[in-house]
Amino acid sequence: CSYIAVMVITTKLNYHFQYVRGWNAQMSGLILIITPIIMAIMAPNAGKLSDRIHPQKLAAIGMAIATVAMLILTFLTRDTPLYLVVVAMILQGFGMGLFSSPNMNAIMSSVPPKDAPTASASQATMRTIGQTMSLGLLTLVFAWVMGSLELAPQYASMIVQASQTICLICTVACVLAVFASLVGIRSSDKFNTEK
């Protein structure tokens, strides 16, 4: 769920900046780099923190923050102030940075050392599947809303409608990811007490 949301945000915001706000690709790219920069700063620190705090708790908090960002972007229109978009991007980067390393820590800590390569490969596969599904979902929703119309500024209202629909779907996916992390906490706590 988490990786579906991340890829969708980048592509959706790129469309929004270029076709709804009328920015060029260079300006869009400059602002889109905010989220990965925040993620790059957060992820290593979250990884260290997950050695002291239950990693699934951190992952759940990170996913909850990313869910708030997605919810903000669900209401994105042509008139949404840019600072609000930037706040959502910062929250998305912070949330995903807080989610990714602790999530990997939780996965790798839950398997015996001999199964670590399989667990790592499975996680990488799930990430790739999520990213691929996100672009498929984005294409499906845009095709549903816009039909065979091209992405162009004259169809800005349809692009906004498709973007809002995508964000609503991804908000639900993020909520499911938060609950999955919380269930994982309870399961691992129960497992640890039984050991």
Outline where the language-model segments fall.
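12-transmembrane solute porter fold
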Residues: C1-G147, I159-S188
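Short, Lys/Arg-enriched, Gly/Pro-containing loop segments at transmembrane-helix junctions
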Residues: A152-P153, S188-K195
